[in-house]
Amino acid sequence: MTVTDHREAMIEARAAVTDVREAMDAYAEEFAADVNSIRTDSRHRENIRDMRAAVDAYCESFATAVSTHHDETAALRADLEATAAAFDAYTTAFAADAAAMHDVSALHRDIEALREEFRAVTTDFEDYTTDEFAPAVGALHADAAETAASFTAKQEGFEAYRHDVHESAVPALTADIAATRADFDDTAASFAAYARAFYGHTDDATAQTDADDTTAQTDVLSGQATVTRAQPEEDDTPEDMVQCRVCEEYYQAITEPHLQTHEMTIDGYRDEYGEDVPLRPDDHA
């Protein structure tokens, strides 16, 4: 490159610098004008003041948030450290447990001791079964057999008593009562015949009068006899008792066990003597 070329280049550079300087001067003038305008404009000042207050508030809030974040970070770090310590302790305990599990000699000893206890308990149970339980069961069976035999003997005795009383004594007593009633009827008939024979030979008027008297007396005597026979069934009947139609005896109630002595049930008793047959004293009403 020649000197002329250098000179032209420098001239161009100077011209460019001059243009830049002029542009900078123009920009400086415009910037100064803008600054002056902003300084003189109160609205821009208020906006700047509000913006500065907002920036200050934000800075305070940001500082508070940063402090809170630092506190939370510290707490989280402490929790992490505690968790890490717990995991370390668990790892140590787990390793110890694993080592203990690998060593099964103690378990074998415990199992063998348990087997020995089972053998001892089995031996004791077998001894108890042979020496105490089996004899006790045998004695219990013997007592049960003796009790059953005693019950059987008592039942047979009761059956014999029932047979003697309800099948022998009661029918005999009923027959005696029927014979006594028949004798009483015969006596009443004989007395009436005697009265007719005694008053039958007088004159007509006297005979008529005597016959009327005899008839009246006979009626009275017959009525007395009838009343005497009917008295046990009506007037002398206890108010709190009821008569059995089979044996004609009086009881507080006609029950199934009593009817079984006559080989009869309550249904059969009602079929025989009617559905309204009294079974209790209150049934008369």
Swiss-Prot record:
Looking at the keywords, is Repeat present? Answer: yes
Which terms are listed as keywords in the entry?
A: Gas vesicle, Plasmid, Repeat
GO cellular component term, pick one: gas vesicle
Please report the residue spans annotated as repeat (sequence).
22-52, 53-84, 85-122, 123-155, 156-188, 189-220
Q: Tell where it localizes.
A: Gas vesicle
Tell me which domain of life the UniProt entry assigns to the organism this sequence originates from.
Archaea
- Which Pfam families is this protein grouped with? Halo_GVPC
Chain segments carrying region 6 X approximate tandem repeats: 22-220
What drives induction of this protein's expression? Answer: In PHH4 (a deletion of the p-vac locus) not transcribed in exponential phase, transcribed from stationary to mid-stationary phase. Small amounts of longer transcripts that probably include gvpC-gvpN-gvpO and further downstream are also seen. Gas vesicles appear earlier when grown in static culture, possibly due to O(2)-limitation.
GO biological process terms, semicolon-separated = gas vesicle organization
Leader peptide range in chain numbering: none
Q: What else is known?
A: Encoded in a 14-gene locus called c-vac which produces cylindrical gas vesicles only in the stationary growth phase.
Which protein family is it in?
A: Belongs to the halobacterial gas vesicle GvpC family.
Function as written in the Swiss-Prot or TrEMBL entry? Confers stability, involved in shaping gas vesicles (GV), hollow, gas filled proteinaceous nanostructures. GVs allow positioning of halobacteria at an optimal depth for growth in the poorly aerated, shallow brine pools of their habitat. Expression of 2 c-vac DNA fragments containing 2 divergently transcribed regions (gvpE-gvpF-gvpG-gvpH-gvpI-gvpJ-gvpK-gvpL-gvpM and gvpA-gvpC-gvpN-gvpO) allows H.volcanii to produce gas vesicles.
Q: What is this protein called?
A: Gas vesicle protein C2
